[in-house]
């Protein structure tokens, strides 16, 4: 029994040391790209949006053209401007040349016209659902009082505020094959800011939308999302897709940013430089793999000791074994390592009661903090003084009993001798 206890203590110390060595940096696990084929020139960035953890990266910091993904920033600034989205604006004459340039470049539009009165919210739907370049220009003009250059400057400033280091904008829509550049990593930063805006996500997650009639459009018009993964009739449709944005130009290739949410967990994905035949296949395979490979699992139970702590004033035990007061679960890959840091009470002296809280353990999964749990004992540890006192009291009690027994027999024996002497004396008479 003593050898078994010593072995458990040694094993616990070795485990604690090993775990301390492994807790260094987040993102320790390396996951292989789970898709059938991917062009080595593409940029891919998959991240767990709940804890901002990178999962897959390929050329994630490479600067490249981003086409209509530009409109994510345009929409973000529009929503952050504080303007009333239900109010109407009139398309100004100052956009005449801008609209001609968009038309000459064969850019997608919702056919806005100079002098047309439209609601801001309809411009936002046109921007994010139909990827309309004229809607982008109208939005920028509205926010910056007609100065598109000032709006572009604000786009670049906002990108820096979000931590982007490879991003530069020269126009508000990304239609032209020059200027607007970013990286998969930077676009993830912009996407996270967009995802925090409820209106953005509601609009971007819309499959189709009806634009109301205006003073220059007598009939309603229905626009359909360029994000085909929102379409149930499309082969790569996924019900976990949550909006965001598509983009395409000759130099940029097919670009895609999306969020995906399932069973309470959210991923963000950026793919740049793909092609029409593969962009949605790649996205669906990557996200399917993520939801299949990562799951909720119990990381810590309450029956296995996590660590030990030195114990004073107790000859029977040199240390106390500490257990988690409650189970701890986390979401991760089967290969993710569980590590701990401890905050233990100092100068622990017996007596220690069963269930005493003697510290905390912070639990990490693949280097990312999951939570903190109390550390408790599963038995009582009695002090030397109490043990010695109990032993002394037991010994004294035993001596008292022994003395009582001896006294009893002495009295009995003494009484018998006295009776015998009396009988002998009586016979002599």
PLM region spans:
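Polar/charged alpha-helical tracts
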Residues: 8-9, 97, 150-153, 391, ...
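A general structural signal for well-ordered secondary-structure junctions
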Residues: 20, 61, 84, 133, ...
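Domain-terminus/edge residues, biased toward the C-terminal soluble/receptor-binding domains
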Residues: 164-168, 176-428
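Bacterial N-terminal signal peptides that target proteins for export
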Residues: 2-14
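Active-site-adjacent loops and short helices of periplasmic peptidoglycan-processing enzymes
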Residues: 3, 27-185, 189-198, 262
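Intrinsic disorder/low-complexity detector
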Residues: 9, 26-27
């Amino acid at each position: 029994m003593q050898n078994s206890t010593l072995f458990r203590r040694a094993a616990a110390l070795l485990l604690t040391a090993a775990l301390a060595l492994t807790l260094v940096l987040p993102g320790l696990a390396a996951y292989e790209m789970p898709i059938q084929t991917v062009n080595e020139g593409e940029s891919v960035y998959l991240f767990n949006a709940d804890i901002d953890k990178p999962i897959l990266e390929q050329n994630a910091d490479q600067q490249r053209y981003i086409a209509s993904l530009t409109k994510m920033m345009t929409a973000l600034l529009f929503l952050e401007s504080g303007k009333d989205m239900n109010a109407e604006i009139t398309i100004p004459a100052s956009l005449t040349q801008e609209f001609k340039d968009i038309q000459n470049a064969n850019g997608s539009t919702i056919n806005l016209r100079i002098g047309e009165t439209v609601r801001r919210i309809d411009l936002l739907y046109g921007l994010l659902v139909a990827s309309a370049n004229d809607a982008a220009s109208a939005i920028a003009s509205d926010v910056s009082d007609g100065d598109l250059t000032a709006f572009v400057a604000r786009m670049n400033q906002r990108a820096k505020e979000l931590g982007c280091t490879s991003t530069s904008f020269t126009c508000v829509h990304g239609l032209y094959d020059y200027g607007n550049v970013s990286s998969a990593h930077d676009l993830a930063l912009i996407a996270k800011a967009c995802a925090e805006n409820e209106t953005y996500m509601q609009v971007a997650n819309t499959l189709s939308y009806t634009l109301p009639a205006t003073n220059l459009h007598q009939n309603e018009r229905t626009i359909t999302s360029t994000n085909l993964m929102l379409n149930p009739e499309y082969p790569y449709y996924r019900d976990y897709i949550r909006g965001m944005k598509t983009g395409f130009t000759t130099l940029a290739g097919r670009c895609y940013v999306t969020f995906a949410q399932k069973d309470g967990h959210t991923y963000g994905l950026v793919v740049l430089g793909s092609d029409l035949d593969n962009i949605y296949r790649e996205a669906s395979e990557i996200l399917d793999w993520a939801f299949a490979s990562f799951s909720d699992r119990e990381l810590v139970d309450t029956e296995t000791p996590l660590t030990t702590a030195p114990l004073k004033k107790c000859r029977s035990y040199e240390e106390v074994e500490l257990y988690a007061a409650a189970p701890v679960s986390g979401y991760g890959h089967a290969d993710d390592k569980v590590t701990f840091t401890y905050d233990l009470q100092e100068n622990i002296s017996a007596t220690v009661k069963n269930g005493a809280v003697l510290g905390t353990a912070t639990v990490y999964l693949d280097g990312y903090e999951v939570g903190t749990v109390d550390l408790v004992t599963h038995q009582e540890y009695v002090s030397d003084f109490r043990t010695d006192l109990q032993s002394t009291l037991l010994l004294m009690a035993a001596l008292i009993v022994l003395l009582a027994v001896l006294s009893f027999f002495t009295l009995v024996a003494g009484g018998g001798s006295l009776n015998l002497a009396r009988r002998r004396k009586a016979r002599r008479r």
